[in-house]
């Protein structure tokens, strides 16, 4: 004999399998309806196609029990299905199955968009569809949000809290006081220039050129306009003055040569004398060689003849 508890468990598993089949069938029907609407099938043809077909799938025979008794389960309506679920399933699974069985795709999408609109107020329809919201906010507020996120990440890693002001200085976020000081030093800058820290100075080109020409005129006086523009100054000199300067330079040069020659002559003579004396001292005396005269040769021959006689 089969125990009642085991039989109840088997029946419970069978009913759960049946519910799963019903859920898959309802999902398939919704998919067919969505495909027909996307293909442009009229509503009358969709209604005609659904006539004559059962609302539930064909009855599926359950597995045979050990007592060789075949049981089938049939739910004529959704009310009976809900009653069965309420009786045999826990509350949590009951709610989850009901929400899955009766959920609508359009309702789910609308709920997601409502949640998105709650998180990002003031967003447009395109922003809702793309899930991207362009925030229009104060840069200081945005910087505070970013610093807060950085602090949260650091605290999650290290487990310690850090001062927001220190994080601002470490990240290089400009303070409002710094921007005010910048505006004081560089007046007339725009908001974008304050944010970027770059100030484009507006200077009149005529004023700038005039100041440069004044500086050039100070360095080289009596300069014409063309000479100021080209940077070349043609000096105007009197020819008589130039010739006089050349004559003076030649006269001074000749005087220098004449004054240098008498003083240099004794020094040159002294050096030559010392050189001659050194050569005389270092010179070696030559040996004198006498050449025999003719008479001496004749006397030698006579003596030789006398020697031969003896």
Swiss-Prot record:
InterPro entries given for it? FAM153 (IPR023249)
Q: Which domain of life is it from?
A: Eukaryota
Q: Where is the composition biased (Basic residues)?
A: 283-297
Q: Where is the signal peptide?
A: none
Region: Disordered, residue numbers: 39-58, 108-136, 156-184, 250-297
Compositional bias (Low complexity) at which positions? 259-268
Record's compositionally biased regions (Basic and acidic residues): 270-282
Q: Which residues form a coiled coil?
A: none
Tell me the protein family, please.
Answer: Belongs to the FAM153 family.
Q: Please give the name of this protein.
A: Protein FAM153A
Q: Record the organism.
A: Homo sapiens
State the encoding gene: FAM153A
């Amino acid at each position: 004999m089969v125990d009642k508890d085991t039989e109840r468990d088997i029946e419970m598993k069978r009913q759960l399998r049946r519910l799963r089949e019903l859920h898959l069938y309802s999902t398939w029907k919704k998919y067919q309806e969505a495909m027909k609407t996307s293909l442009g099938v009229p509503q009358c043809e969709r209604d005609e196609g659904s006539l004559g077909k059962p609302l539930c799938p064909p009855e599926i025979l359950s597995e045979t029990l050990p007592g060789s008794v075949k049981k089938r389960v049939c739910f004529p309506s959704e009310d009976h299905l809900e009653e069965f679920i309420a009786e045999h399933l826990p509350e949590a699974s009951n709610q989850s199955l009901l929400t899955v069985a009766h959920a609508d795709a359009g309702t789910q999408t609308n709920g997601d968009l409502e949640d998105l609109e709650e998180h990002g107020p003031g967003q447009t329809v395109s922003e809702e569809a793309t899930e991207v919201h362009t925030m229009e906010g104060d840069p200081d507020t945005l910087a505070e949000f970013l610093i807060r996120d950085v602090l949260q990440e650091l605290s999650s890693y290290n487990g310690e809290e850090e001062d927001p002001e220190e994080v601002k200085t470490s990240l290089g976020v400009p303070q409002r006081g710094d921007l005010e000081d910048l505006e004081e030093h560089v007046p007339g800058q725009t908001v974008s220039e304050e944010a970027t820290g770059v100030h484009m100075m507006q200077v009149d080109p005529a004023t700038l050129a005039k100041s440069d020409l004044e500086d050039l005129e100070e360095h080289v006086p009596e300069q014409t306009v063309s000479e100021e523009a080209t940077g070349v100054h043609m000096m105007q000199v009197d020819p008589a003055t130039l010739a006089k300067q050349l004559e003076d330079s030649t006269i001074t040069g000749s005087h220098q040569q004449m004054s240098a020659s008498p003083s240099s002559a004794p020094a040159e003579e002294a050096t030559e004398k010392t050189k001659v004396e050194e050569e005389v001292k270092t010179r070696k005396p030559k040996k004198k060689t006498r050449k025999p005269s003719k008479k001496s040769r004749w006397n030698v021959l006579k003596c030789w003849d006398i020697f031969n006689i003896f």
